[in-house]
């Protein structure tokens, strides 16, 4: 699934974060007390998200908490555009859930495929291009829109 979405999958012992725009590193060791992420996702050599993989048939209930713990456990020597990491996946290979912490009200949603590295890069760059200091997504930008005045009342 990751390879089909454009990710290069590597083991932690042979990781080369510059091998491609999107690199998924297996069994990535996090800070003490945070365990190992099944996959840590890097875009342009910067950590952006985590994946917790479960066996087919296992429930994903409660796994979102595990990925949230992983998202705050990135060792400081690894660059990340945002901490805690904003993109969290839980997957059995059949069922996949995704939480985008750039959303103003983040929550896990079922998705049918992993996002491509370019999609993450676009989301992280969107507001930087617009001159806003905080990355965001459409829902956040829509909430920041000014109130429209009703010009009909002034005719």
Where are each of the predicted segments found?
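ATP-dependent helicase/translocase motor core
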Residues: 1-155
